[in-house]
């Protein structure tokens, strides 16, 4: 999988502070380290939820059998009129009377503008649609996919500026005495007020009717970091977009999940720019998830595609999976949703091509990162949280060590992983990652990984690590083994760990980034005395 480097923080004049001040600052900063919370898993013992949301239900593979989707905890199709799924995707024609202007024909649908559609009429129809697509209240994901206009006026740039132009025309037709500047201001106010009402009241209705599902809007939050052609692209989200996301606090307050998207274009194929793009978008989603309450963050389910957005018949290569999935997992999200269109399943040939891609490239990699992440969470967090990067903006990945492990596709079509982790593998976890504890759980990083005596973790379809470890013991206070409940009564035996190389510059404890902050304080403390 290639070598991945780890960037480390350079410490400045930390020694300028007295020992007492260092101690005081450390104690002040420790709570900020321990406050890095994540939402608990939707399904117990499934810290990383894999969701398949593509129309493959009629696909037949090379063995004349349906595609094997057993790896995914939730499988659903975005086809219309399919009801009672664990993931429900509401397009513009499936939830109420969403007002928009058809981007292809220019046709006005339901008034075209939120100012011109009766909200109560929309909500009555939305109620019917929710009860139709979700006949029972069960645990699942409810995603509203409204992309035609954005609730933030300024973000409706070309070609969505038609909503701004039509809104201005509406105000001028109603109030011809207004000058242009005032008409624009009124149009902005009216558009944002009614757009907010449409999105917010629809969200509240969904939560009231089906409270067990996690409700949110697809592509929210976004950070518009697609400036790939700029020199020295680093993937950062423009500061103005962070502020605009802050201004959507009303939306985050009533969402029960976030559904950002990190679809890749061929412009970043096999390029580090793809990793930077994904990394920063996910990091912004994590920031937004904590705006309302950093101790009770919203769960985040990231949408990905298996193909490029501008080349819908070209599958992502392994490098691109590393730059997407590989970036998402160590940042610490609740799950990943794989979305696909009919282009994946338009013929028998395309179905067989998808099956071959899944068996040869996709599933081995997903198994890799899933078990690595779960093992890290068990070893370092005792299953009370998930492993996340100590420094989010580095190339450290939760991968198996290719020297110690091998994922094999057996003749029966099932995967098995051979090998077991070395002490060095577990030490890599401790060097590069720390625990982000689940909400309302007090956990801390395990530092004595040499005392780990066994690992036991599984994927949802029971591809398991069940290994007894025989590391030299440095202490007599060995702890009992930690087990994964999902591995009970399973026959598969496998092992996995991280592939990030060791670095002598990484601090041996999980306070490295806090100490970095401390170093900043130390450099400026003398000016405060």
Swiss-Prot record:
It is a lipid-anchor; GPI-anchor. It is found in: Cell membrane. Residues 1-35 form the signal peptide. The active site is at 147 (proton donor). Disulfide bonds join 59-351, 223-237, 376-387, 381-435, 437-464. It comes from the Eukaryota. SUPFAM superfamilies: (Trans)glycosidases (SSF51445). Involved in sperm-egg adhesion. Upon fertilization sperm must first penetrate a layer of cumulus cells that surrounds the egg before reaching the zona pellucida. The cumulus cells are embedded in a matrix containing hyaluronic acid which is formed prior to ovulation. This protein aids in penetrating the layer of cumulus cells by digesting hyaluronic acid. This is Hyaluronidase PH-20. The lineage of its organism: Eukaryota, Metazoa, Chordata, Craniata, Vertebrata. The gene is SPAM1.
């Amino acid at each position: 999988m290639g070598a991945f480097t780890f960037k480390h923080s350079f410490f400045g004049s930390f020694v300028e502070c007295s020992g007492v001040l260092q101690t005081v600052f450390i104690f002040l900063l420790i709570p900020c380290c321990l406050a890095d919370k994540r939402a608990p898993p939707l399904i117990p013992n499934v810290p990383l939820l894999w969701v398949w949301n593509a129309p493959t239900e009629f696909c037949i593979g090379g063995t004349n059998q349906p595609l094997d989707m057993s790896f995914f905890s939730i499988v659903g199709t975005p086809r219309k009129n399919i009801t009672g799924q664990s993931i429900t995707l509401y397009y513009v024609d499936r939830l109420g009377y969403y007002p928009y202007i058809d981007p292809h024909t220019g046709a006005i649908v339901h008034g075209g503008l939120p100012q011109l559609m009766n909200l109560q009429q929309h909500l009555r129809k939305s109620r019917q649609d929710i009860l139709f697509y979700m006949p029972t209240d069960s645990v699942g994901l409810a995603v509203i996919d409204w992309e035609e206009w954005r609730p933030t006026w300024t973000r409706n740039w070309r070609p969505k500026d038609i909503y701004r132009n039509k809104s201005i025309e509406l105000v001028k037709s109603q109030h011809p005495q207004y000058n242009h500047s005032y008409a624009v201001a009124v149009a902005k106010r009216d558009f944002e007020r009614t757009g907010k009402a449409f999105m917010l009241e629809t969200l509240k209705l969904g939560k009231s009717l089906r409270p067990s599902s996690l409700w949110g809007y697809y592509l929210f939050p976004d950070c518009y970091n697609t400036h790939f052609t700029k020199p020295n692209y680093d993937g950062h989200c423009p500061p103005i977009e962070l502020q605009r996301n802050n201004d959507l606090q009303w939306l985050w307050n009533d969402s029960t999940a976030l559904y950002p998207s990190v679809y890749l274009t061929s412009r970043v194929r096999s390029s580090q720019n793809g990793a930077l793009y994904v990394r920063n978008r996910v990091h912004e989603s994590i920031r937004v998830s904590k705006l309302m309450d950093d101790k009770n963050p919203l769960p985040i389910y990231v949408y990905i595609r298996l193909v490029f957005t501008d080349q819908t018949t070209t599958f992502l290569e392994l490098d691109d999976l590393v730059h997407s999935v590989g970036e998402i997992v160590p940042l610490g999200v609740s799950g990943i949703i794989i979305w696909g269109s009919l282009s994946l399943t338009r013929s028998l040939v395309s179905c067989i091509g998808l099956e071959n891609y899944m068996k040869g490239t996709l599933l081995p990699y997903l198994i890799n990162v899933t078990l690595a992440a779960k093992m890290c969470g068990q070893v370092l967090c005792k299953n009370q949280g998930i492993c996340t990067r100590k420094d989010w903006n580095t190339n450290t990945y939760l991968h198996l060590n290719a020297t110690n492990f091998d994922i094999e596709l057996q003749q029966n079509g099932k995967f098995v992983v051979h090998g077991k982790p070395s002490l060095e593998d577990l030490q890599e976890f401790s060097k590069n990652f720390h625990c982000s504890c689940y909400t309302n759980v007090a956990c801390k990083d395990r530092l004595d990984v040499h005392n780990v005596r066994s690992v036991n973790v599984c994927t949802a379809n029971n591809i398991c690590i069940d290994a007894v470890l025989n590391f030299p013991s440095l202490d007599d206070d060995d702890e009992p083994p930690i087990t994964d409940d999902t591995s009970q009564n399973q026959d598969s035996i496998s092992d996995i760990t991280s592939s990030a190389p060791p670095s002598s510059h990484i601090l041996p404890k999980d306070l490295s980034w806090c100490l970095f902050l401390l170093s900043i304080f130390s450099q400026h403390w003398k000016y405060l005395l």
